[in-house]
Amino acid sequence: MIEVIEKIGSKEDFIHFLYLLSKDFKKNLQEWENQTIPDFLEQMASWIEDYSTCPANNIEWERIDYKVLAQIIYMGKIYE
């Protein structure tokens, strides 16, 4: 999955990644540490808190559009 993430360069690539992640969850549930939405979201937040202060961090946190990211995640809740 890391190889797919490293190649994301467009909206289409990101959508493809989301579908792959969904298929992976269905096929390999036992490999997922966070098997519920609350656990998944809480650990995503925890990872951001931890990794954003890590010296090995290679993410440009100030360049992320957090409002768009929040909207994408929220739409997963309400979109039919």
Say what each PLM segment does:
Residues I2-Q30:
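N-terminal acidic leader/helix
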Residues K11, D24, W47-D50, C54, ...:
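Surface-exposed polar/charged interaction patches
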Residues D13-F17, F40, D65:
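Alpha-helical structural motif
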Residues N57-E80:
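Amphipathic alpha-helical binding modules
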Residues Q30-R63:
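Amphipathic protein-protein interaction modules
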Residues L21, M44-W47, L69:
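Amphipathic alpha-helices that form helix-helix packing interfaces
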